[in-house]
Amino acid sequence: WSLLLRENYPSWLYPITKGATTIWAHWAGIMENGDFWTRDMNSYNHYAYGAVADWVYGNAAGIRPLDGYPAYEKISVSPLPDKRLGWLSCSYRSRHGLIRSDWKLQGDQWRYEIETPVDAVITIAGQKHEVAPGTWIFFSAVE
């Protein structure tokens, strides 16, 4: 979470503080002092660091296929909320239908809303729930 949410170099938000609207080839494409990292090789539309999206879907939202069930035939949803973000909404359109993992901070608890088109194992605050297709709402204490 810290690398994702930090605004100083190196981080994913650092380029945004310098005006980026795409993913740069180098985290310091434009350095703190405003100079270019190098004038010879600076791509400002380079997906190499875009793998953070995989981390957001697979960890922050917790959406993953269950081992032994390719193509999201059965899924695991184990979200990892963080107070610094406060809320997250991710969805993935699988061949079986929409998978959605939302969480948000509500007072002193987390509210999770999980939608699954297939059987799923949903893990919230260490507790596993085996569920059928549908939309499920869970709550857990903020730690």
Segments (PLM) and residue ranges:
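Non-catalytic C-terminal accessory modules of carbohydrate-active enzymes
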Residues: 1-143
